[in-house]
Each structure stands twice: as structure tokens, then as C-alpha cells.
């Protein structure tokens, strides 16, 4: 971990489309957090507000977990401050979220009031064209990711048939101490983005990191996933 900061993606662009695990922002084994759900369209300052809150928290000695947007890794989807049991979260599409019990577990902040409506109106036609182009580019990108994902899954399946799964499972059980039983926390450390593949593996506080490249590494990780499925583990 660097400077009290950890980074994740709560959702990722994958060969099966966009997959979100926003429920993993707060670990299931943690005490309840109070969540400020930020509303309003693009350009109203949701990410900017979260960045400023994160900077202030770090400056005051708090650990901060940053959750970046897979559509723009420089933009924030959420910020968590564990010691304060506090979350700031973008609750707009495509991951629309609202407090389950407003006033008890969270509240909504409407940043739409800060939208420069006249500026948007002046560029109305341009913005509609750009939105259509963006949608077309995403459709093409996900088609490519889907094709790559199919090839990857086929390769991993073939590797699993030739691997000694019993030996792998024995190695995992003997070599790693499992956390206590519970519900795992699922998030992403890498994702394809419009800026390329973003990788946050170095922004963690793991004592030891083991890299398992290639399709055989994927087989190994699949078995590890099965082993920790019902434990308090970050996956």
C-alpha cells in the first residue's frame, strides 16, 4: 500500500460484458458504513468531490480505498474511508444505486444543481453525436472482448484437462492458511479501459504477491477461488 491508499475497480469491462461488484465496496465482514450517494449527470463534479475528500482524508492520516471507473480510470466511482466507516459513491447509470434506508445507512446528495445547463444546451447537437459515436465504439470494443474471452476460456479449459488438479488443490490447502468462514469480497484489480489495460495490483498491501502467468496460472487461480469461496477473503 502506498501513502494510505488502495485502488480497485468495482466494475470491469470483460469478455462477458460489463460486470459490477459494487456490493464489494464495503467488505461483508465490516461494520455498517454510512454512504453518501452522489447523483447528477456527467460534469457536475461527482468524481472531483470524491477526489478532494480522499485527499483530505489521507492528509489527516486515514487510509483511503479508491474505486476507479473502468470507462475512465482517472475518474472515481467511489471512495471508502474504513476508519470512519464512510463511503462516497456515484449512484448514477450504468450502476444506479440508492440508499436502502435513507437517513440510517446513507443519504443522497444531488449535485445536479451545479450543472451548467446553458453550456450543455449550446452544444446539444454535438453532444448527441458524440454520445452515439461513443456507444458505437463501446459496442465494437465489447465484441472484441467477447471474442478474446471465448478463446481464453477455451484455452483455460484445455489446460485444466491436462493439469494435475489434485496436486494443485493439495498444494493450496497445505501452503496457505485460510481466513475464517464468511463471505468473500469481490473486486477487480485490472480492467480494459479506453486508455488501455489498467492494473492496480501494485497498489495493494499484500505481504506476498505470487504471479501466475498464462493459462495454467488461470487454472491455479480457479482452484484457489473455489477454496476461499466461503471465507472472509478479498477475491
Residue positions per predicted region:
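N-terminal pre-Walker A segment at the start of P-loop NTPase domains
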Residues: 1-27, 162-203
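Glycine-rich phosphate-binding P-loop
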Residues: 36-54, 195, 206-235
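Short, flexible loop segments at the rims of nucleotide/cofactor-binding pockets, characterized by
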Residues: 14-15, 64-69, 187-190, 215-216
Amino acid at each position: 500500500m502506498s501513502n494510505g491508499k488502495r485502488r480497485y475497480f468495482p466494475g470491469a469491462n470483460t469478455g462477458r460484458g460489463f460486470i459490477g461488484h459494487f456490493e464489494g465496496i464495503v467488505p461483508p465482514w465490516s461494520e455498517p458504513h454510512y454512504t453518501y450517494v452522489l447523483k447528477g449527470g456527467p460534469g457536475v463534479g461527482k468524481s472531483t468531490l470524491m477526489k478532494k475528500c480522499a485527499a483530505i482524508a489521507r492528509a489527516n492520516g486515514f487510509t483511503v480505498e479508491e474505486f476507479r471507473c473502468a470507462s475512465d480510470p482517472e475518474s472515481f466511482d467511489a471512495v471508502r474511508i474504513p476508519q470512519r466507516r464512510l463511503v462516497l459513491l456515484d449512484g448514477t447509470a450504468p450502476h444506479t444505486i440508492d440508499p436502502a434506508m435513507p437517513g440510517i445507512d446513507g443519504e443522497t446528495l444531488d449535485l445536479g444543481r451545479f450543472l451548467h445547463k446553458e453550456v450543455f444546451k449550446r452544444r446539444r447537437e454535438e453532444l448527441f453525436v458524440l454520445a452515439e459515436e461513443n456507444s458505437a465504439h463501446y459496442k465494437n470494443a465489447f465484441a472484441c472482448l467477447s471474442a478474446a474471452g471465448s478463446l481464453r476460456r477455451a484455452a483455460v479449459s484445455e489446460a485444466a484437462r491436462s493439469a494435475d488438479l489434485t496436486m494443485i488443490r493439495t498444494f493450496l490447502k497445505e501452503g496457505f492458511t485460510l481466513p475464517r468462514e464468511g463471505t468473500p469480497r469481490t473486486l477487480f484489480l485490472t480492467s480494459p479501459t479506453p486508455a488501455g489495460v489498467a492494473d492496480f495490483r501494485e497498489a495493494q498491501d499484500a505481504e506476498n504477491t505470487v504471479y501466475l502467468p498464462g493459462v495454467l496460472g488461470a487454472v491455479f487461480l480457479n482452484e484457489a477461488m473455489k477454496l476461499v469461496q466461503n471465507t472472509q477473503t478479498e477475491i
